[in-house]
Design a protein with these regions (language model features):
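Sec/Tat signal peptide C-region and signal peptidase I cleavage site
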Residues: 17-22
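Short loop/turn motifs that connect adjacent beta-strands in outer-membrane beta-barrel proteins
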Residues: 23-24, 37-44, 56, 88-98, ...
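Surface-exposed strand-loop-strand hairpins of Gram-negative outer-membrane beta-barrel proteins
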Residues: 24-26, 54-79, 118-130, 172-173
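Outer membrane beta-barrel transmembrane domains
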Residues: 27, 66-67, 212-341
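Residues on the lipid-exposed face of transmembrane beta-strands in outer-membrane beta-barrel proteins
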Residues: 35-37, 49, 81-88, 139-144, ...
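Transmembrane beta-strands of outer-membrane beta-barrel proteins
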Residues: 45-47, 95-103, 152-158, 182, ...
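Transmembrane beta-strands of outer-membrane beta-barrel pores
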Residues: 51-57, 103-109, 160-166, 204-210, ...
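Residues that define the transmembrane beta-barrel architecture of outer-membrane proteins
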Residues: 74-80, 128-138, 176-182, 225-233, ...
Length: 341
C-alpha cells in the first residue's frame, strides 16, 4: 500500500510540477525595453506595435541545472502588444506626463512527454495545452519623465495589470494570468557622448501580485495562492550611426540584456493529490538573458523600427529559452513641428 501510494504521489507531483515550473515567471515579460529605456516620447500620441516570441525546451531546478532529462517538449508563446502613449505639450513638476496602455493578444502552447512512471510500462504521459485570444491588459496611468540636463532622460511610474485574459483554474486553454498585478517602473538613459550617439540604458520593474485560484492536476480540487513578488532589470548599451549626412535616417545598434528574480515567497497552498502543500515551498525563480538590438530610425517622421534577440544563459526553478522582439512605433506630434527652413 505504501509503495502504491508513493507511486501515485510521484505521478501527481510530476503532472503538477512540470506545468507549475513552466509557468514560473512574473507578469512582466522581459525584453520590452533595451536601448532608449529612459527616452521620453515627443508630445502627442505614440502608437507602438511590439511582437514578442518566447520559446524554451529546457526546465531547470533551483540550482540552474536541467532536470527531467528524459522529458521532452516545448513551451512557447507569442504576444502582440498594442501600446498607446499620450504626452501633453506642457510640463508638470518640470517633467512630462506620459501615461500609456498596452492591449495584448497572445498565443501559447505547452507540450511535454513524460516517461513511463510504472516499472514495465511502455507508455508515458503527454501534457499539452494551448490557446489564443485577448491577454491581460497593462495600464500605466501614472508615468512621469524628465530631461535632467543634457545627458540624462529619466522616467518613473505606477502601473497595474488587469486580468482580462481568459483564465480558469486547471484549464489547458488559459491566456491570462488569472490575477491582478501592481508595478512600479523606472527608465534611465545616460548619454555618454555630447551628441547623444552613445548611450547606456536601464529599465526596472517591481511587481506585486494578487490572489489567483489554482487547481489540483489530478483531483481538480481548487485552492488559492498569491504569486511571489518579482523584480526585473533590463539594460542596454548602444551606438547611433547616421545613414545619411543630414541625419534623416539613423541606425542604432547595441548590446542588451535582462534579469528577473522572484524576491518574496508564494503565499497560500497547492493541492497535490488532495494534500495541501505550502506554495512557499516552491523555490524562487530567476532568469538572465543577453543579446543584441538593432533599430532603424526616421527622426523627422517619428518612426522607429526595431529587432531584439535574447538568449537566456541562466535560469533557476523555471524554463530556459530565447526571446525575439520586433516591431515599430510612430508618433503623431501635437503640435506639429514647424518645417525646417
Amino acid at each position: 500500500m505504501t509503495i502504491k501510494y508513493a507511486i501515485l504521489v510521484s505521478a501527481c507531483f510530476l503532472a503538477s510540477t512540470l506545468p507549475l515550473l513552466a509557468q514560473q515567471k512574473g507578469q512582466w515579460v522581459p525584453g520590452g525595453f533595451g536601448l532608449n529605456a529612459g527616452v521620453i516620447p515627443d508630445p502627442g500620441i505614440t502608437y507602438a506595435n511590439v511582437a514578442v516570441n518566447y520559446s524554451a525546451d529546457r526546465l531547470n531546478n533551483s540550482n540552474g541545472d536541467r532536470i527531467l532529462q528524459n522529458v521532452t517538449g516545448t513551451y512557447s508563446f507569442w504576444v502582440d502588444e498594442n501600446i498607446v502613449y499620450y504626452v501633453p505639450n506642457h510640463k508638470i513638476l518640470g517633467g512630462y506626463f506620459m501615461p500609456y496602455i498596452s492591449i495584448n493578444a497572445a498565443t501559447g502552447s505547452l507540450v511535454a512527454d513524460l516517461p513511463p512512471l510504472l516499472p514495465g510500462s511502455m507508455s508515458g504521459i503527454r501534457l499539452s495545452g494551448g490557446a489564443s485570444g485577448l491577454a491581460d491588459t497593462y495600464v500605466e496611468p501614472l508615468n512621469m519623465g524628465w530631461h535632467l540636463g543634457n545627458r540624462v532622460d529619466f522616467n518613473v511610474g505606477y502601473a497595474f495589470v488587469a486580468p482580462t485574459g481568459r483564465y480558469s483554474a486547471g484549464a489547458s486553454d488559459n491566456v491570462g494570468s488569472g490575477y491582478w498585478g501592481n508595478n512600479v517602473t523606472s527608465g534611465t538613459t545616460f548619454y555618454i557622448t555630447k551628441n547623444k550617439g552613445t548611450s547606456a540604458n536601464l529599465f526596472t520593474d517591481f511587481e506585486s501580485h494578487g490572489q489567483k485560484t489554482v487547481s489540483s492536476a489530478v483531483s481538480g480540487q481548487r485552492s488559492k495562492i498569491t504569486p511571489g513578488q518579482a523584480f526585473t532589470m533590463e539594460w542596454g548599451i548602444g551606438q547611433a550611426l547616421p545613414l545619411k549626412k543630414d541625419l534623416s535616417q539613423l541606425a542604432q545598434l547595441g548590446l542588451v540584456g535582462y534579469d528577473q528574480w522572484q524576491v518574496t515567497s508564494n503565499g497560500g497552498n497547492y493541492l497535490v493529490a488532495g494534500i495541501p502543500v505550502a506554495a512557499s515551498q516552491v523555490p524562487y525563480y530567476s532568469v538572465h538573458g543577453i543579446g543584441f538590438q538593432a533599430n532603424y530610425i526616421l527622426p523627422a517622421k517619428g518612426v522607429t523600427l526595431f529587432f531584439k534577440y535574447y538568449d537566456e544563459y541562466l535560469a533557476k526553478a523555471r524554463i530556459q529559452g530565447r526571446t525575439f522582439v520586433f516591431g515599430g512605433s510612430w508618433t503623431l506630434r501635437i503640435p506639429k513641428p514647424a518645417p525646417k527652413k
